[in-house]
């Protein structure tokens, strides 16, 4: 939820700042995209994207669009509240949490970023809010 997301990001930023370690911010949908893409009838390496969606009680459906090419995830549309009735095409997957697999992917992505010379500063890691806790802003 909203509060849990804020607390988790603040805790990660504080630990990275105080320990002087890099921090890589990746959305949970982007982490699961490579794993979930394997469930598609045809791998979307052709350039066509796919959607990951999650129903939020009393809020609607949150969705993000992704493309995976040789294991590299490209976020086409970040997770956001979808307009009711919006057509997403045929490649739509329900979000499926696998914390262990997604944490391993996050650590591998951080390691790859550091090998490539990226600094991964904690200051750039901010939460995303696909829905506003107070309504439209």
For each feature predicted by the language model, list its residue ranges.
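Oxyanion-binding and handling regions
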Residues: 24-137
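A short acidic, glycine/proline-enriched capping/turn motif at secondary-structure boundaries
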Residues: 1-2, 31
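DPxDG-like acidic metal-binding loop motif
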Residues: 2-21
């Amino acid at each position: 939820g909203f509060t849990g997301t804020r607390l988790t990001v603040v805790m990660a930023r504080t630990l990275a700042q105080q320990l002087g370690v890099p921090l890589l911010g990746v959305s949970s949908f982007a982490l699961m995209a490579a794993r979930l893409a394997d469930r598609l009838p045809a791998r979307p390496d052709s350039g066509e994207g796919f959607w990951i969606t999650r129903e939020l009680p009393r809020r609607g459906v949150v969705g993000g669009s992704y493309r995976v090419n040789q294991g590299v995830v490209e976020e086409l549309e970040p997770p956001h509240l979808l307009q009711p009735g919006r057509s997403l095409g045929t490649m739509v997957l329900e979000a499926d949490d696998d914390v262990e697999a997604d944490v391993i992917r996050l650590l591998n992505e951080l390691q790859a970023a550091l090998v490539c010379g990226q600094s991964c500063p904690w200051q750039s890691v901010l939460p995303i809010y696909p829905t506003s806790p107070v309504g439209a802003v």
